[in-house]
UniProtKB/Swiss-Prot annotation:
Residues 251-534 form the YjeF C-terminal domain. ADP binds at residues 445-449, 465-474. (6S)-NADPHX 2 binds at G358, D475. The gene is nnr. In the N-terminal section; belongs to the NnrE/AIBP family. In the C-terminal section; belongs to the NnrD/CARKD family. Residues 410-416 are annotated as: NADPHX 2. Disulfide bonds: none annotated. K(+) binds at N70, D148, T184. CDD domains: YXKO-related. (6S)-NADPHX 1 binds at D181. Its EC number is 4.2.1.136, 5.1.99.6. It catalyses: (6S)-NADHX + ADP = AMP + phosphate + NADH + H(+); (6S)-NADPHX + ADP = AMP + phosphate + NADPH + H(+); (6R)-NADHX = (6S)-NADHX; (6R)-NADPHX = (6S)-NADPHX. This is Bifunctional NAD(P)H-hydrate repair enzyme Nnr. Residues 69-73, 152-158 are annotated as: NADPHX 1.
């Protein structure tokens, strides 16, 4: 079991190398034969296919098999589907004598089944000649489904012929495609398309998700991803997950364990004081949403500070949340010296501070943010214009700050912080690199959102919904994060929990509404509902 509570409670997402290590541990140290693993994997995939598309009795299924163990999994799937009554046509993309040992064994089992007459004429096995011949062969079958078992996690270079043509061919079919482990042509670590890649409707992945299914082109190429239990012990997967490049992903179970509980004798100051600093004309709504999100996440006492020019707006919108006006200067931004004095008592008594929603980019405001970061010893969340104020100064501020901090950039903000070096071709590595460099928890928002800690611990958000593609959801996320930190969650767990709960709230909205109609304030109504339904019975684990 990994030392971090985030790692222990969130399941692993593995690289190809880590998955190979898990196979090796299971076979050599745990004593489970490779053939048994293949059988369990194929049987599990066949069951998932039946669950999604069945019953497949008398339906035609075309199984495309490569020469490696991915192809062997496909041969096991073919055997189980045909014995369950499907009409199965197996296409071998290589000569039988080129198959891996376990795949060759499974081909012999299929041929024996065919020879025994046990499945009648429902099983046919052929070698690929060309796609024109294949088209003619499968057209009379009217396939219900295609299974991609051509290439698995070992692929690192562009797909070559004849598999390249097969990928293009299967992508042109109208029936759905199920990929085994990863879609052929997808890099299992980066999600990059290696020349061509299968566009699957579903992917049955073995033992644990692969990183490439979650990043890059993975989500659009893999479709719905289901994890198939192949009999690997959990401790084997945890051990493999310690390999470089592996991450974890959020789950309801993890958030339930982290979710703050209240003692019967709790009072407002005992369950977290959060301070939100934000707002500037015309963005007064941003700190309002953040402050409300902090309260909806359970912080007992929330205060909101903003420029005096919008104080009346903040006070009118936040009838249950005290507001604090900050002096402004000649540039219409916050006056640094006077504002720091005005904020001192609130900052000293807060358990966590959020800086940035709607704050604006006036020079005085940016100077105020940088001085606040240098001086306060309260945990910080920096978002939006709070991040923009750090651009060009973040490396020195990382050394000068007094408290832990969470940075919540979207792609544009991240590039401004990281400069020309901040390429996002590999989102996970980028978040990890700069979290370590800035000694921060970096919540890099996007697809997927990545939470990386300064020691390398990394958690992906596991809920993605287009409902979140609307203005203001980042303000709500930042407010959730500071609210959870104020209640005692570690910065990494607070960021991961906020990400998961916000996604669950958007998902909940989309279950009863058109996701395109959601606005950020709808999340404020959904967060307490989702918390009660899915997380509220948990115990706090900081």
């Amino acid at each position: 079991m990994a030392s971090s509570d985030a790692e222990a409670l969130c399941p692993p997402v593995l690289t190809a190398g880590a998955m190979q290590a898990a196979d090796r541990y299971t076979i050599e140290e745990y004593g489970l034969p490779s053939f048994t693993l293949m059988e369990t994997a194929g049987r599990g995939c066949a069951a998932r296919i039946q669950d999604a598309y069945g019953p497949l009795e008398d339906e035609a299924v075309v199984v495309l098999c490569g020469k490696g163990n991915n192809g062997g999994d496909g041969l096991v799937v073919a055997r189980h589907l045909v014995t369950d009554g499907a009409r199965v046509h197996v296409v071998l993309a290589s000569a039988p004598d080129e198959l891996s040992d376990d795949a060759a064994h499974n081909l012999s089992l299929l041929r024996q089944l065919q020879a025994d007459g046990a499945v009648g004429e429902r099983l046919t096995i052929g070698e690929l000649e060309d796609v024109e011949t294949l088209t003619a062969a499968v057209a009379p079958l009217r396939p219900r489904l295609y299974v991609d078992a051509l290439l698995g996690t070992g692929l690192t270079s562009d797909v070559r012929e004849p598999i390249r043509s097969l990928v293009t061919w299967v992508n042109g079919r109208t029936a759905p495609t199920v990929a085994l482990d990863v879609p052929t042509g997808l890099h299992s670590d980066t999600g990059a398309v290696l020349g061509v890649a299968v566009r699957a409707d579903r992917t049955a992945t073995m033992a644990a998700p692969k990183v490439g299914l979650r990043v890059g082109e993975g989500p659009t190429r893999a479709g719905t991803v289901e994890v198939v239990d192949i009999g690997m012990p959990p401790f084997v997967l945890d051990r493999a997950a310690e390999k470089p490049g592996c991450v974890r992903e959020t789950t309801d179970a993890a958030v339930r364990a982290w979710w703050p509980a209240r003692d019967p004798d709790a009072y407002k100051y005992s369950v977290g004081t959060a301070l939100i600093v934000g707002g500037a004309p015309p963005f007064a709504g941003a700190p309002v949403m953040a402050a409300k999100a902090a309260g909806r996440s359970g912080a007992g006492y929330v205060r909101c500070a903003g420029p005096e020019t919008i104080h009346a707006t903040l006070a009118g919108a936040l009838t249950t949340i005290p507001t604090l006006p900050l002096p402004t200067g000649d540039d219409d931004g916050i006056a640094p010296d006077a504002a720091l004095d005005a904020l001192a008592e609130a900052a000293d008594t807060a358990d966590a501070i959020l800086v940035g929603p709607g704050l604006g980019r006036a020079p005085g405001t940016a100077q105020f943010v940088r001085r606040l970061v240098r001086t306060v010893d309260t945990p910080l969340v920096l978002d939006a214009d709070g991040l923009n104020a750090l651009a060009g100064h973040i490396d020195e501020l990382a050394d000068q700050r007094q408290a832990p901090w969470v940075l919540t950039p979207h792609a544009g903000e991240f590039r401004r912080l990281a400069g020309e070096e901040g390429a996002l071709t590999d989102r996970v590595r980028a978040a990890q690199t700069y979290a370590e460099r800035w000694d921060a928890v970096c919540l890099l928002k996007g697809m997927p959102s990545v939470v990386a800690g300064p020691t390398g611990r990394t958690v992906l958000g596991s809920i993605a919904t287009p409902a979140l593609a609307t203005a203001g959801t980042g303000d709500v996320l930042a407010g959730q994060c500071v609210g959870l930190m104020a209640q005692g969650l570690s910065p990494l767990n607070a960021a991961a929990a906020a990400l998961h709960v916000g996604g669950a709230a958007a998902e909940r909205y989309g279950a009863t509404h058109d996701p395109r109609s959601m606005v950020a304030t709808d999340l404020l109504d959904m967060i307490p509902r989702v918390a009660a339904e899915r997380f509220g019975e948990g115990r706090r684990q900081r």
